[in-house]
Amino acid sequence: SVMKNITDAPIHVQKRDKEEVYREARELLMKMGLEDKENAYPCQLSGGQCQRVAIARAMVGNPTLLLADEPTGALDTKAGNQIMEIFRHLSDQGMTIIMITHEPAIAACADKTYHILDGELRTSAEPEGGADHAEA
């Protein structure tokens, strides 16, 4: 289930208190708009909902860094925009998000971009400057 997916590692690997982890997971599901999906299984979720579950899972423990590899790549525009709105909110709260994307429009949302082209690292202070050539 969604809840098991979010809580297994903190409870069994990190040995955190089960009640505390479940409370935190429920709060995260509310923030992700998934409070009614706690007992759902992956086959019952949309792609965007699965991505939001993955973000909630990564957020347990209130990390200061989130790594996101193609977080919108398999999503339709609406779901991708929802994920980016979540990232904007997290960034506004002080979280650092490192995101890998091939989508120039998604890269343009970043405060800072790094582009890799033909194995060479290129840095751009402005997301629009060179985002059309992003091959990261």
What label would you give each PLM region?
Residues 55:
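Hydrophobic anchor residue at the start of the ABC signature
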Residues 40-43, 61-62, 93:
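Conserved signature/switch motifs of ABC ATPase nucleotide-binding domains
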